[in-house]
Amino acid sequence: EGDSVAACMKNWGFELPADATEADAFNAIVAKYPSLAEAVDAEKPEGTTFTSLLNDYETKYTKGIETGTSAANISGIKKTGDYSMTVSLTQVDATAIYQLGVTIAPMHYYGEKTKYNYENNQFGFDKGDLSHVREKTTTPLGAGPYKFIKFENGTVNFEANDSYYLGAPKTKYVNFLQTQEDDKLNGVVTGTVDITDPTFSSTTVDAIKAANKNDDVNGPAITTDTVDNLGYGYIGMSANTMNVNNEPGSDASKAYRKAFATVLAAYRTVAIESYYGERASVINYPISNTSWAAPQAADPGYKVAFSVDAQGKDIYTSDMNDEQKYEAALQAALTFFEAAGCKVENGKVVSNPEGGMDTANYAIEREALIPADGKGDHPSFMILTEASKALEKIGVHLIVTDLSDSTQLWDTIEADQADMFAAAWSATPDPDMYQIYFSGMDGKAAGGSNYMYDINDAELNQLILDARNSLGQSYRKTLYKSCLDIIVDWAVEVPVYQRQNAIIFSTQRVNMNTVTPDITTFYGWLNEVEKIELN
């Protein structure tokens, strides 16, 4: 999760240093899949090349666009002035605007003025001829506040672009340093770094307070700005492996998963408070709190995740202490196991839904995978271990496997062999749920991450499409609440936490009056970097 290269690559099973670059990510991919690079770069002994293995390579893969009888222009794109245009769509799509974040380049750069005649559908180049574009590959053009000067000894040097459209930046030079995670905070303290983004752990907080000498994360040495991370942590279950009679969407299968989810959910608060302290909060729906579609406690129909039994009765009361809540969760789990078809006697599960035993010693035995570096270093590790101890009391064996290599997690999920797993999602500004929860219908393919949970619900699919086809935020929020209720009912995802990210500034060297005020999850200090001045 998160925005760093290392965090993003971890979601795909790659362990990289905290300061990994995009080049490091590419090299890691090539290292894992060397045959791909070898096929592209070299011929096989018998003389077969990678491209020769592609059917009709010359006709299908050597041209970027179709020429000849193709359209002379795109009717939905209209020039309205020298510096303005409109884009029209064939249908309403709330997510379309996020697909239009394209880089703007002047015609004199990508084309030739002599070949431009808008009225005659000439746009500065010969259609299908990319030679002029390729000439610019080694001479990039940008319009940002700073110009790239060089990369040397782990430092990227930038110089102010005096022609920047919002005005020349106040600070002439900006350097970006390759830095190890452990060196970020120390760099600000010692004066080698002015702005950075350390992992906002308890250790980091204590070190910031020590530097400020005032028991506060804001002070004479360091100023801290925190925002909610664009994403959330969860514990997932595969509907294809965690079900009854190979019917993932049946009531019995949902009850089976809810039995586990109810116990897991009970330990979220103690685990997250232990791991993050005040820097994270427990969430009750599988959506980041940064989203406008996230349900709020005051909203009608809001429920604490997995807080009712199989009969729909609330299992917690306001006067319960933690131990009483854990016991209530166990008793509720037994009602769900019974609803799934398990036999329960004397407060224990004595048979699985099929009437037998999963193993010689346990009626039910399942495994939860967690990439905690083999040492329990993960926000959800305590949840799983405490839930495992609790489930043991009712005759259910939950194996918690702590993976030192997270690649095993993603490989197991993709192979459809994982029961439960702890992970996190990176979110997007729009709450569209197609990618994760849409299982395919009416000729539309399933979302690319649907395999994570294997959820397949016709009503959910339709709600996702309906929400895409509206621009009304209130209406879409209502639809997404219905989507979230269905996802919770499937019990394929236990929402766990919303954590914070931190940006720290050297109070001594950065003029904080010039830094972007009211930094948010979606709008950070870099959006107004041209305004920043040093003291």
Model segments located where?
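Append "and occasionally in soluble cytosolic enzymes with long acidic Gly/Pro-rich linkers
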Residues: 157-159, 251-389, 531-533
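Alpha-to-beta junction loops
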Residues: 83-85, 184, 190-199, 387-390, ...
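Ligand-site clamp/hinge motif
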Residues: 154-210
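Short, well-ordered beta-strand elements
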Residues: 85-86, 144-149, 156, 172-178, ...
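A bilobed periplasmic-binding-protein/Venus flytrap-type ligand-binding module shared by bacterial periplasmic
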Residues: 159-164, 227-255, 263, 272-273, ...
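Aromatic- and charge-enriched surface segment that lines or borders ligand/interaction sites
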Residues: 1-53, 57, 80, 86, ...
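Detector for C-terminal structural segments
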Residues: 94, 262-305, 379-388, 411-535
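Gly/Pro-rich hinge or "lid" segments in bacterial periplasmic/extracellular proteins
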Residues: 44-74, 82, 89-93, 101-169, ...
